[in-house]
Amino acid sequence: MLQTKSNNSAADLVCDVLVVGAGPSGIAAALELQSTGQTVVVIDKAFFPRDKCCGDGLTTGALRILDELGFDPQTVPNWTVCSDVWLRSPSGSEMQFALPTKGQFAAIAPRIELDNALVQLARSKDIRVLEGHEFVSVRELTSNHITIDVSSNNKIETVQSKFVIASDGMWSPVRKSLGMSTPGYLGEWHAFRQYANNVTGVANERLIVWFEKDLLPGYAWSFPLPNNRVNIGFGVVRDGKRRIQDMKDVWTDLLQRPHVVEALGPDFVMEDRHTAWPIPARVDEAVTGSGRVLFVGDAAMATDTLTGEGIGQALLSGSLAAEAIIQGGLPVEVRNTYAQAVKLHLFADHRMSLRLSKILAHGRGARGAIAIVSKSGNWGKRNFARWMFEDEPRAIAFTPKRWHRKMFRLKGPYQS
């Protein structure tokens, strides 16, 4: 790697892999690559810590990858482990689903803290993370390397690498620069989120999911944080029937519903303003690579179309992209390796989620599904909770290539 003018400068850098975007998918890729001796540079237009509109929930799948990457939950001040899940059916009935106790199977981690901790982990591994550096364009693409222009302090700098991993979000500037954007694309989900404090009801310690009839197949949530705070929000599918402009009214109404007020307590206080974000969830249609560029996370539209959750998919896709580069070969071979890995690990789960989403789109389907699980006994409830939080891939029963000896018997992440 060439010397630079400062630790936060990209001036004339040369590296093996440039990662555009320092979110979970980008840092996961960087950590995997660095562990095999690859020189990696990560750029991000933001300065950390920075907030990210998100529900902050971590599934078992996400926790397992974080554990494998050597991430320490203690570096996130408000990390909250959840031991069970509470679901409310459209009929109003509530059910508790216990998670296994050996290890962590669900956790809440504010993204402003989680993403910053991941960046610091990368730096502790001698990965150069350049903040305030924004991708501008692809300057040159040859048979040996790719060169991009980066903007920092109103100056254009260049970075040359063998590959670029674009972890730069749903509206990926890298994808756009390659002429691969989809005009007018607004994602498959849309979500609202806000923090609340002075929560004195049961929500201050429960992970709650409300299946509201008017939100199906979407849902509302309240995820607990320390000091009587929660992350509360809702997500809906973009089905052409809902006007996103009306979501603010839905939000106001949701916070006044008796069961929500009861869960939060009478004196809860909403913090700052609400934030909203679109969620891409069609990984089976996404182009995962072009030339010497691989797309990961939201840039690969890799979120769960059933829940809108994306941190686990982001971490997984970043790791898969890194593994494809490590395996080596010509750019077309690397792209194909990554595309096949994404297909193996994400396509079947995506299609399963689509089918389930259709069932949950109607009150009768949601009520019936929850009723069946509620009558399945402790074993059924516990394993449903593990399945819901992706302890195993959602469609693993139908994808024999992913079967393993410890299927459904894996130890929990962060098991002391």
Ranges and model annotations:
Residues L31-C54:
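Glycine-rich FAD pyrophosphate-binding loop
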Residues L63, D67-A117:
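A conserved beta-strand/loop capping segment in the N-terminal third of enzymes
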Residues N78, G240-A324, L330-V332:
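FAD/FMN-dependent oxidoreductases across multiple families
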Residues L121-E262:
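Predominantly flavin-linked oxidoreductase catalytic cores and closely associated redox partners
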Residues E323-S416:
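C-terminal helical "tail/cap" subdomain of flavin- and related membrane-associated enzymes
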